[in-house]
């Protein structure tokens, strides 16, 4: 029995990056032997075990053969006769097909180290095209390593396009797709993930609502980058630069879907795109089986992001409706996430990335003013039920009027014209 360190741990060590987890391949052993040594089986599809002391994953060396459609359409063969090289050859990219023996010697049959040095994401073999999930994985690696100068090899991009055109991507389960998409959105360059998918035709297959945004113009006065798709990529890049959580990045990804439905004769204006986009946002959320918090925020950002951008112009009554819609009294964190998404939207414009966004502070102050209204004095007046709700609403509206007047001063009301 021989044990080798494989995959990401080897790759990241050679790149000088932190190694967060280590995977191992076991050659020349059977499942029964590992069980006898105290390893715990965890693999549902192929023999993977957890080390009894470290908890790290140990997999028996295996080969795989295409036997059906999609990510799960493979037959696996694991036995003591499978060699390390055979196991490495089934992997997706050359940079993931390296191993180290127990003395730290590198085993690199696919020239992964050379591709690391030359910054290529290159497939190991033509068998790459048998697994549609690899399209998403390569795009995710492109998003992760773009800051280091990595790019997808032309021949690999061609295979990705072949997969996209084959219809195999439609066989991916929502759960597998969401796992890759959500991980990719949290990489250092989520914009590269979307662009890579688009360049190979996969975006049209997986997220056609987003693909439809490219080539759609916006008013240059507000969007110097003009193209809605390019704006979306810039917003995602701002999300990464500001360390936004997944829920904000997902909302930003979907916030402008309505612009993809605007008739060309109405360009570059997109009247009521917020409302028009809600049906599309719901469709993407359902298809991807996004978590509930991601679904909720994406719909709220899609519907109300223009309210946020115009926050300083909103009447106190409209502002109160916005705060109540977000339930800022019980769910303040969701309102913070909404503000963050809108700020990323505003910063994702060519040349305006560093412009201040005073709407954020203004809305936070408005929420604080509304929350500061005390309920107890109203209860002491004997108010209850609907009467209490109406009285509380009046007091909050009064507080917002005072807040706007105090913060904006002479701008609280429209200036007189001569």
Curated annotation (Swiss-Prot):
Task: Please list the GO terms describing molecular function.
Answer: ATP binding; CCA tRNA nucleotidyltransferase activity; cyclic-nucleotide phosphodiesterase activity; magnesium ion binding; phosphatase activity; tRNA binding
The catalytic activity, as recorded, is:
a tRNA precursor + 2 CTP + ATP = a tRNA with a 3' CCA end + 3 diphosphate; a tRNA with a 3' CCA end + 2 CTP + ATP = a tRNA with a 3' CCACCA end + 3 diphosphate
Q: Which residues bind ATP?
A: 8, 11, 91, 137, 140
Q: How is the cofactor bound?
A: Magnesium is required for nucleotidyltransferase activity. Nickel for phosphatase activity.
Keyword presence, Magnesium: yes
Gene Ontology BP, a term: RNA repair
What EC designation does it have?
2.7.7.72, 3.1.3.-, 3.1.4.-
Q: Which CDD domains match?
A: HDc, NT_ClassII-CCAase
List keywords of the entry alphabetically.
ATP-binding, Hydrolase, Magnesium, Metal-binding, Multifunctional enzyme, Nickel, Nucleotide-binding, Nucleotidyltransferase, RNA repair, RNA-binding, Transferase, tRNA processing
Gene3D superfamilies registered for this protein in UniProt: Beta Polymerase, domain 2 (3.30.460.10), cca-adding enzyme, domain 2 (1.10.3090.10)
Among InterPro entries, the record links this protein to: CCA_bact (IPR012006), HD/PDEase_dom (IPR003607), HD_domain (IPR006674), NT_sf (IPR043519), PolA_pol_head_dom (IPR002646), PolyA_RNA-bd (IPR032828), tRNA_CCA-adding_enzyme (IPR050124)
Task: Tell me where in this chain the HD domain is found.
Answer: 228-329
PROSITE patterns in the record: HD
Q: By its UniProt entry, which Pfam families does this protein fall under? A: HD, PolyA_pol, PolyA_pol_RNAbd
Q: Does the record's keyword annotation contain Signal?
A: no
Which cofactors is this protein said to need?
A: Mg(2+); Ni(2+)
* Role of this protein: Catalyzes the addition and repair of the essential 3'-terminal CCA sequence in tRNAs without using a nucleic acid template. Adds these three nucleotides in the order of C, C, and A to the tRNA nucleotide-73, using CTP and ATP as substrates and producing inorganic pyrophosphate. tRNA 3'-terminal CCA addition is required both for tRNA processing and repair. Also involved in tRNA surveillance by mediating tandem CCA addition to generate a CCACCA at the 3' terminus of unstable tRNAs. While stable tRNAs receive only 3'-terminal CCA, unstable tRNAs are marked with CCACCA and rapidly degraded.
Q: What does the record say about domains?
A: Comprises two domains: an N-terminal domain containing the nucleotidyltransferase activity and a C-terminal HD domain associated with both phosphodiesterase and phosphatase activities.
Q: What else is known?
A: A single active site specifically recognizes both ATP and CTP and is responsible for their addition.
Q: What is this protein called?
A: Multifunctional CCA protein
Q: Which organism is it from?
A: Azotobacter vinelandii (strain DJ / ATCC BAA-1303)
